């Protein structure tokens, strides 16, 4: 279970006394998620999520994340809304960790998204980008192109233990992407981690977007590239162009891509795949003793990179004018 910090009943009761959310009826740890400690709270007033932020989330970034969720929720986006204390603060401390309570969203994530899910996700992504357009705070993407070589340095010596010639392939990818990475694309607030487990559905419609703790200021099309990687590959490693077409068309129905974004899409998809391959590789090679959370397979994204290297045109992802 992804509960890294144990919370005694007495400490939780004292923490909740600062909130106007009714009396606690029950609570339980949530197994999903690998970055933070999460609990489901059931009170006399409703259901909530309590999150304790562990070491991978920088405390100085929390005002950005919490402010963004409040901003997006106020503009009608279905996302967790931080619950403020009676004193008006959203961020507290519990068992030595920064902690926040957010609203509970109905819905379930899908493990095997279909074309209709990809279409709904494209609309939701465009809605997120629009809702965040006037958010005043900025946060640079700490896992963009400048971070990839330092990440690789943590794993380079052992990379070929994971797959033959992985280090050589990665060095070539880094050189190519660092040379050509676009810096002038339309941008603003992006989610940057919109995998299937961070999107809730009721039926075929998106009911909520969660886990904004990689959100940052970057290119909108890079966010789309992350989603194409996460949603449109099949278990056998093939790219499903029908899903890609549905996602891109739905996104463009709300926010048409500019020609320079379309031209950059193959490069952005390569970069998105490399980013997740590298963070997974570092985690794979540094599993702490006794860890209960299994690291994600970096080779899934090595295989996706092999596809992206062959792509020369955004049409291969399903884009059409």
Curated annotation (Swiss-Prot):
Q: What is its EC number?
A: 2.7.1.39
Give the catalysed reaction(s), semicolon-separated. Answer: L-homoserine + ATP = O-phospho-L-homoserine + ADP + H(+)
Kindly report, in one word, the top-level EC class recorded for this enzyme.
transferase
InterPro entries found in the cross-reference section: Aminoglycoside_PTrfase, Homoserine_kinase_II, Kinase-like_dom_sf, Pseudomonas-type_ThrB
Q: Which Pfam families match?
A: APH (PF01636)
Q: Which UniProt keywords apply?
A: Amino-acid biosynthesis, ATP-binding, Kinase, Nucleotide-binding, Threonine biosynthesis, Transferase
List the molecular function annotations (GO) for this entry: ATP binding; homoserine kinase activity
Pathway linked to the protein? Amino-acid biosynthesis; L-threonine biosynthesis; L-threonine from L-aspartate: step 4/5
Q: Which BP terms in the Gene Ontology apply to this protein?
A: threonine biosynthetic process
Q: Which HAMAP family match?
A: Homoser_kinase_2
Question: Which protein family is it in?
Answer: Belongs to the pseudomonas-type ThrB family.
- The molecule here is called Homoserine kinase
Q: Which organism is it from?
A: Methylobacterium nodulans (strain LMG 21967 / CNCM I-2342 / ORS 2060)
Gene behind this chain? thrB
